[in-house]
Amino acid sequence: MSEEMIERHQGDEMIRLTLMDGQVRVMMCETTQMAQRAADIHGATPVCTAAMGRLMTATSMLGVMMKGANESVTVNVHGDGPMGTIVAVANHGDVKVCADDARVELPLRADGKLDVGGAIGHTGRMTVIKDLGLKEPYVGTIELVSGELGIDFAQYFTVSEQQPSLVSLGVLVNGDVVLKAGGLLVQPMPGCEEETIEQLELRSPMFADISREMTEAPKEQLLEDWFRGMKPVVLDRTPLRYHCGCSRARMEKALISLGRKELQTIIDEDTGAELGCHFCHQQYQFTTEELRQLLEKATRE
């Protein structure tokens, strides 16, 4: 029996599917538009765009795995490279990112590729924080393996979630333009047959350079080609977007959380306050009078 064609969709989205009657779980996503949005917001250089794009892609996969409406995942990557700390936050379809320094410039690697590992650093740690709406979040931390992020996320899944995984992440950039961004996650489920794992290992070179592959064919065609004969079945598709979600109300809460003493100090300086969002660079101004009202509110609470 011939395998069905996967319906073609345009734009950023996550496709979840199974192979070999559920023996293998696969997630593939296109994240071109949100990588471009991140580059524009942060004025990022090509290598920083690639780093942030890869991190958003992998974090969006973790986000789509979350079940609850108010659940979210935050991934902090703290390497010894010049970008400093990079943070991505995702829920079921929305993702945002920021970095200490998104304007780092580095020479290309010897193979002509962007030096993402050099920008992030080869030594450091990656921390995954899952807010499941419980009292305490789930926190998993690993040491960075390469800083290129694909192998680092594979290590995270294997060590922290006891789930052997193949992760491919890619962002193809030309100057200020993101040509293609996306990622693939392949996870053999418990009880997966050895023959199936061998098939995946044989095919893995085909999706090693995923962003370049995605410039040459639709993501759906790539899935059909890569997993032909392995009974791919699409489970669901989730639109993805860069979305911050900051608001004046949230900034008010942030000011109140400083505490009465700190708020009073700001009021005494009588210059008001300006808070900026790290993820979208929106600025929020508060007058001294507005700060007094927040102080009263903090005192009541």
Which residues does each predicted region cover?
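Interaction interfaces in information-processing and related assembly proteins
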Residues: 2-236
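Cys/His-clustered metal-coordination modules, chiefly Zn-binding fingers
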Residues: 205-301
